[in-house]
Amino acid sequence: MAFLPQRNFVEDILANNYNLNNGTTAFTSTNIAEYNTFSIQVNTTGLGGSNRFVLEQSNDGSNWIPINEDIYVLDLGSGTLSIQKADFSGKYLRVRLLDAGNGTITIILISKR
């Protein structure tokens, strides 16, 4: 029996075309604590400023804490963030925009099982 290599695949589109203003959030409804490994891809369009945002986690969907101290900047409007499983103890993830501006954001979970 041949073993197929494990590969990345798009598991869920967690948030699609959220309209964001300064300080607003897009968050998941999927319990991502169930995944073995994951990375997050964020695509933004039409946002003003430098597209800075932070990642936050929650166990209950209401009390949010930062995953780490990093502030992410997407100058080109999209990017893949490497979130290690060890860095994440919550069930839910959200992206909180720090810059003023309007636009949309899509969050995609890319997972290996």
Predicted regions and their residues:
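Transition segment at domain starts
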Residues: 1-35
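Solvent-exposed serine/threonine-rich low-complexity stretches and specific carbohydrate-binding patches
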Residues: 11-14, 66-76
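Edge beta-strands of jelly-roll/beta-sandwich modules across compartments, strongly enriched
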Residues: 101-113
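Conserved Ser/Thr-centered positions that define the repeating blades of beta-propeller domains
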Residues: 57-58
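Aromatic, loop-rich ligand-recognition surfaces of beta-strand-rich domains
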Residues: 28-50, 109-111
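Exposed aromatic-hydrophobic patches
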Residues: 27-30, 79-86
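Noncatalytic modules at the cell exterior or secretory-pathway interfaces
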Residues: 36-42, 86-104
